[in-house]
């Protein structure tokens, strides 16, 4: 998780050849990312770390693919805005960025991931000043600093 540069097309292919299903890969990716975000946020806030449960909840996975699934633009199957079916109707209504497309193979994980991300991130697409919010630097400067930090940490998507 700390080194996204190690996730290559060859590595992804080796996971699939080893028996990890494409939708399982997306679920693992989503859960790992959500847990990392929660851990880093609680650490940054100085709060107590959240403990993971000792066992997973019992249940059966849906194992159903949304309409319009195709490989690309990366290595795993996704659904493009043009091919999105009813389960993704309102997902692409605010523009299309490839990171938003990355988990579309498993809509439940997509929604779980973005419920968290939407609460942690500033809204897209414009970098507007927030009316009535006083601070020392502008929102554009905040976004610039975030971009530089992301580049420094090799956090690219």
Which sequence ranges carry the predicted segments?
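Hydrophobic alpha-helical segments
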Residues: 1-157
């Amino acid at each position: 998780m700390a080194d996204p540069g190690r996730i290559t097309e060859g590595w992804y292919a080796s996971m699939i050849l080893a028996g990890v299903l494409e939708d399982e890969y997306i679920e693992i990716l989503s859960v790992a990312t959500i847990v990392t975000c929660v851990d880093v946020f609680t650490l940054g806030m100085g709060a107590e770390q959240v403990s993971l449960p000792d066992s997973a909840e019992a249940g059966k996975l849906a194992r159903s693919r949304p309409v319009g699934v195709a490989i690309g633009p990366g290595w795993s199957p996704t659904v493009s805005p043009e091919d999105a079916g009813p389960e993704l109707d309102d997902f692409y209504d605010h523009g299309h960025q490839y990171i938003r497309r990355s988990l579309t193979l498993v809509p439940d994980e997509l929604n779980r991931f973005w419920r968290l991300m939407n609460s942690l991130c500033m809204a897209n697409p414009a970098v507007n000043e927030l009316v009535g919010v006083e601070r020392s630097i502008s929102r554009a400067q905040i976004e610039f600093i975030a971009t530089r930090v992301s580049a420094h940490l090799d956090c690219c998507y």
